[in-house]
Regions:
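Transmembrane core module of solute transporters
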Residues: 1-86, 193-204
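Hydrophobic transmembrane architecture of multi-pass small-molecule transporters
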Residues: 91-190, 195, 199-204
Length: 204
């Protein structure tokens, strides 16, 4: 998968990088990177080409590599060796649980925004809107169908546009969330043994 290309390349280097760069700086760069990726995705349209679709996923591998190892280092920093396995296990549980909750919330948000955009678009679908009437006429001419079938065809396109606009809203929201939570990184105070702690938890 494109997401793993840069992540696989950068992951082995992270230990050396963390010896020279503070983990909080790396995590901050990762969050900025995630936000940038979501901004790119917020530009999607229903006519998106394959390159535009793959590029953000490919680039996401960079902040992914910059994020997970420093995050582990921050979490495990300052803990005695006998506490590291438990802390690593707990952090993994919280990550999976938060991911599940976040996925559910975003899916609900996407559905709500799709309904909103569908409502806004259908408000414009009337006989007084020249673009709408032209679309119906073009569908009838191209498909050689009656008005009701042409209307159904236009409705399908409207549904797709509403879903795309709703998804773009979620991407914008995701980018904003990553920017807003950056200060939380700097509330932490990782110790000098942060990189070693992350390496020690690699198998967990």
């Amino acid at each position: 998968a494109p997401l793993g290309i840069f992540a696989v390349i950068l992951a082995p280097m992270m230990g050396m990088i963390m010896m020279k760069v503070e983990t909080r700086i790396l995590a901050t760069l990762a969050f900025i990177g995630f936000a940038a990726v979501f901004v790119l995705r917020a530009q999607y349209t229903t006519d998106i080409d394959q390159y535009t679709l793959i590029l953000p996923t490919l680039l996401q591998g960079i902040p992914t590599a910059l994020f997970f190892v420093p995050l582990t280092a921050i979490i495990l920093s300052g803990l005695p060796p006998d506490k590291i396995p438990s802390a690593a296990g707990l952090s993994n549980f919280v990550r999976v649980f938060a991911g599940a909750v976040g996925t559910s919330l975003l899916a609900t948000g996407w559905n709500d925004r799709t309904i909103l955009h569908h409502s806004q678009l259908t408000e414009q679908a009337n006989s007084y809107n020249q673009i709408f009437t032209d679309s119906i006429a073009q569908a009838q001419s191209a498909l050689q169908v009656g008005a009701s079938n042409a209307l159904a065809f236009v409705e399908n396109g409207l549904n797709a546009q509403a879903a795309m606009l709703g998804l773009n809203d979620i991407f914008w929201l995701s980018a904003l969330i990553f920017i807003l939570i950056i200060p939380l990184i700097w509330v932490t105070h990782p110790g000098k043994d942060a990189a070693a702690g992350a390496a020690g938890a690699g198998g967990h």
